[in-house]
Amino acid sequence: MTLRTLILAAGLGTRMKSVLPKMMHPLCGRPMVLLAIEAAEAAGGGKPVLVVGHGADAVRECANGRAEFVEQPELLGTADAVRRAEGLLRGTADKVLVFYGDMPLWKPETLRRLAEERAAGPLVMLTGIAADARMFGRVIRDAAGNVAGVVENAHLTAEQKSVREVNLGAYCFRADWLWEMLAKVKPSPKGEYYLTDLVEMAAHDGGASAIPVDDEEEWIGINTRAHLAEAEAALRRRINRRWLEAGVGMQDPSTVYVSLDATVGEGTMILPNTHLEGKTAVGRDCVIGPNTVLRRSAVGDRCRVECSVVEDATLEEDVSVGPFGHLRRGAYLERGVHMGNFGEVKNSRLGAGAKMGHFSYLGDAAVGAGANIGAGTITCNYDGQQKHRTEIGAGAFIGSDSMLVAPVKVGKGARTGAGSVVTHDVPDGELVLGVPARKIRKAGAKSVKRGRR
């Protein structure tokens, strides 16, 4: 039997107290609407249909062609929202699966089970046993134990308030029955049309079936910032369990934050208070953290990043950074680079084996293989109007507190004395020092004490 999926996402989200539409709020780095679409895709049925209202343009743009859309201009209830999609869906499938976009944590196997259930009646729904059922409509059963209807919390009788089985707002309808019965749903005293009325209709027309869902984390509904935080914590636990099962170590998983788009290699250890954000890729056998943020960056095998922030940067294999390093957009550290404490690199490439021990800034620079950047070195790359490049050759030795005033080139094997202000190019193998820096002799001359900075 063929299937289509419908996601209800037209709510105002006023309790979120945010200018951002509710469906655009992120969970572990991904907007809620994309999580809902991915859940629908996993259930089958091709491109889902979203019923949207507030923030419709932003939701459409975020979906990027992965869904079809209908609008619900007035919020007249969930049955009215489904009716808005009839023109798109009628005649396209035998079954219609419906769920709420603000309950985006359904596991693929749960929705597939709902979609594939073979029921005698026209409706199958998901239910759960809630410790606190006040947020949900209660599932009312008849004397034989069959589903008889759903009663919202405000309308419960004293006897019904003891019911703990709740309606989870996810349904699979026989399509022809759905479109026929929607027209028969009567308005509530508030003038709204509720999808839950169809449960009672189905109970009198072949029966409504219920599938229990035990994992309460799947059915977290998001209406407030507190709900959003609860859902994010649940999704984070799910993500971390997956990486632990894949051979990634976490000293304290409760303090590790890995985005849905991040990847981590086997054997890597992630220490407490570490964030892997966006499309970050970490290789095998690394140690990341503690207190580290990797944002949209690539980290090769066997790297060590400690107490540092790495943004839009690339680290090849066997690189060490930190503690307290900051790699900014365009930083590229080749194999075996060491960047010590309190260093910053922006839009610069450091060649294989280069060392930048501490307290240095490299911006808009190219550093050759094996070069040594002494403590306190700064590339003075901005003249007040535009940025300029600095080039440091392979094997160069930059003395402590050197100021390299760009644009400038320091040649291969060249050296600068401590405290030098380099305003002109330094040829290969030469030593310069002073303010401004002047040539003294070839860097290899015997009177120069190698190793001093």
Where are the language model's segments positioned?
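Short beta-strand/turn micro-motifs composed of small residues
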Residues: A9, V52, Y100, T127-G128
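Short glycine-enriched, charge-decorated loop/helix-capping segments at active-site entrances
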Residues: L20-P26, E71, V185-S188
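Conserved core of the sugar-phosphate nucleotidyltransferase
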Residues: D57, E61, G65, W106-K190, ...
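Conserved N-terminal catalytic core of the sugar/cofactor nucleotidyltransferase
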Residues: T2-R4, R30-E116, P407
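N-terminal nucleotide-binding beta1-loop-alpha1 segment
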Residues: M1-S18
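Phosphate-binding active sites in nucleotide-utilizing proteins
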Residues: L260-A298, R302, S308
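Conserved alpha/beta core of the MobA/IspD/sugar-nucleotide pyrophosphorylase nucleotidyltransferase superfamily
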Residues: R164-G265
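Glycine-rich hexapeptide-repeat left-handed beta-helix
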Residues: R304-R453
